[in-house]
Structures are given as structure tokens and as C-alpha cells.
């Protein structure tokens, strides 16, 4: 049985940039053991981070070539799901994008893959699979 995991933008950026935790993310992407998900907001977070750091062309390449080629399902948001993220934002000092990642993990009952220590603020509300 496959396990579901939700990727935070941190995980995909680590993979793309070869930063800390990138090997684990690469293994997850290559493994048939996990269904990998990312919220659309967090995929956009990867896009704008790449655009700022490396330019719009590289960000567009990620969006149009790399992301569609990865075994990752992009999860869109209904209004109710946006409100779930807003409730987390109201209760915790996290970025709104991080709240979407957390809300997706909670809704999907799946661990959130990240190395972003900001998620420690959520305590046990989210099961985090920490990247080293």
C-alpha cells in the first residue's frame, strides 16, 4: 500500500537546488512507495522563489517542464480549503503559504515533508517528516 506525503515548497526547492535534504526528496520521487502531493499555492511558492533567485525563464521552465515531469500531484483549493489555511494563519505565526501546506497535510492525513523549522510552531497539529 502506498503512503501519501505532502511536499512543502522547501522540499522541492531543496531537490531543485541540491540543498540539504535533496537526496531524500530524490529518493521519494524515484520510489513507487509514496503518492506525493503538493498544494498549488506551494508549487507557486517554488515558482516565485526560482523567479527571484534565477530569473523568470528558469521559473517558467520549472512550471512547464520540470513539475509536469515529476510524480507529484498538484492539489487545487476550494474556498473551504482556503478557509482551513486561513484558520491556521489566524492561530499560528506562519506564512500563509506554509498554512496551505499544513492544511493540505491535515486534510490528506499525510505527513508534511519539509526542512522548514517554522512548522515546529504547529506542534502536533501536523505530522512532519523532517528533512535533514
For each of these PLM feature ranges, what is it?
Residues 1-38, 51-65, 131:
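Short, well-structured N-terminal submotif of metal-dependent ribonuclease cores
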Residues 2-4, 102-132:
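Acidic, PIN/NYN-like endoribonuclease modules and their adjacent C-terminal/linker elements
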Residues 8, 45, 98, 116:
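Acidic active-site catalytic centers that drive phospho-/nucleotidyl reactions
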Residues 12-13, 43, 119-120:
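A generic structural signal for short hydrophobic patches within well-formed alpha-helices
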Residues 20, 41-42, 77-80, 100, ...:
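Short beta->alpha linker loops
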Residues 35, 71-73, 127-129:
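Conserved beta-strand segments of alpha/beta enzyme cores
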Residues 72-113:
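Active-site neighborhoods of divalent-metal-dependent phosphate/nucleic-acid chemistry enzymes
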Amino acid at each position: 500500500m502506498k503512503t501519501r506525503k505532502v511536499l512543502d515548497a522547501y522540499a522541492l526547492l531543496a531537490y531543485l537546488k541540491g540543498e540539504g535534504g535533496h537526496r531524500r526528496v530524490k529518493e521519494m520521487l524515484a520510489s513507487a512507495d509514496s503518492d506525493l502531493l503538493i498544494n498549488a499555492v506551494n508549487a507557486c511558492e517554488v515558482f516565485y522563489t526560482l523567479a527571484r533567485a534565477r530569473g523568470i525563464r528558469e521559473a517558467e521552465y520549472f512550471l512547464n517542464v520540470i513539475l509536469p515531469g515529476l510524480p507529484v500531484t498538484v492539489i487545487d483549493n476550494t474556498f473551504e480549503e482556503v478557509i482551513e489555511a486561513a484558520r491556521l494563519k489566524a492561530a499560528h505565526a506562519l506564512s500563509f503559504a506554509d498554512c496551505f501546506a499544513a492544511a493540505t497535510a491535515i486534510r490528506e492525513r499525510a505527513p508534511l515533508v519539509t526542512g522548514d523549522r517554522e512548522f515546529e510552531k504547529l506542534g502536533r497539529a501536523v505530522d512532519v517528516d523532517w528533512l535533514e
